[in-house]
Every structure is written in C-alpha cells, then in structure tokens.
Design a protein with these regions (language model features):
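Membrane interfacial helix motifs at helix-loop boundaries and amphipathic/re-entrant anchors
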Residues: 1-3, 33-36, 53-56, 69-85
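Alpha-helical transmembrane segments
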Residues: 1-18, 87-92
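Alpha-helical transmembrane segments of multipass membrane proteins
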Residues: 11-15, 60, 64-67, 91-95, ...
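Membrane-water interface of transmembrane alpha-helices
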Residues: 16-34, 100-109
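Short membrane-interface loop/juxtamembrane segments of multi-pass integral membrane proteins
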Residues: 37-53
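Select subsegments of transmembrane alpha-helices in polytopic membrane proteins
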Residues: 50-63
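Alpha-helical transmembrane segments and their immediate juxtamembrane interface regions
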Residues: 81-118
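Cysteine-cluster motifs in flexible loop/terminal segments that predominantly coordinate metals
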Residues: 112-131
Length: 131
C-alpha cells in the first residue's frame, strides 16, 4: 500500500520539474514538453507553447505530490487507493489542459519564413526550408 501512494509522488515530482523547466524557458526540444505540430514549427513556438503550459503542469505535479502524501496518511487501504486515483486523474487532467493551452499559444506564433536560396544550385536549399 505504501508503494501505491508513492506513485503519484514520484510522477508529481517529475511533472513539476518538467513544468518548471518549460515555464522558465529552459526545456530543450529533445522529447519532453508540449509536442504538437504547432509547437514543433520553430524554436520560438516551442518556447512559447511550453512557457504557457508550464504553470498548469507545475500545478498538476503539486496535485500529484499532495495526493500521494494524502494517500500515505490515510488509515485504510481503500483511502490510500482513492487518494492515489483522484490525484492521478487530477494530474492527468491538468497536464492535458496545459498541453491544450500551450498548443493554442504556439498557434499564435508566426510560422517561420522559409530560408532563401543563395543561387548556388547546390540542391541543399530544400533541406534548409522548414515547411
């Protein structure tokens, strides 16, 4: 039962850390954060999207940690399981809401202008353009 209550605590700490990195604009584009077509258009869109999603994500992590602590102090096994499940559902809902907000913020960022060709006929310009 002790291990069940630790699940939202550990997940909450990880989610809080990710939200904090996004909010402080320190999250790198290597697999974490809001990863939608809109946020992956440019580095600026990724930065803005994850900054907007940062605060709801931090709150989601705190909800997970609080739910885990509540589960640890519950006198019954059923109370521990209920506290854990409520915390996990709340954490998931807040992370999803933060992702939607981040996606919408990234949509507001202008799409990058395709890189121009210097006329060298090297054939590499298509690799420089991001559609």
């Amino acid at each position: 039962v002790f291990a069940v209550a630790l699940v939202p605590v550990v997940l909450g700490l990880v989610v809080t850390w990710g939200g904090l990195l996004g909010w402080r604009e320190k999250l790198s584009d290597r697999g974490a954060g809001v990863r939608t077509e809109a946020t992956l258009r440019s580095a600026e869109a990724f930065r803005i999207g994850n900054k907007v999603a940062g605060l709801p994500t931090i709150v989601a992590g705190v909800v997970g940690v609080v739910a885990g602590i509540a589960g640890l102090v519950m006198p019954t096994t059923a109370g521990t399981i209920v506290a854990t499940l409520v915390g996990l559902v709340g954490m998931f809902a807040l992370v999803a809401a933060g992702g939607v907000l981040g996606h919408r913020a990234a949509l507001a960022v202008r799409a990058p202008v395709p890189a121009g060709c210097s006329g060298c006929a090297c054939g590499g310009c298509s690799a420089l353009q991001k559609a």
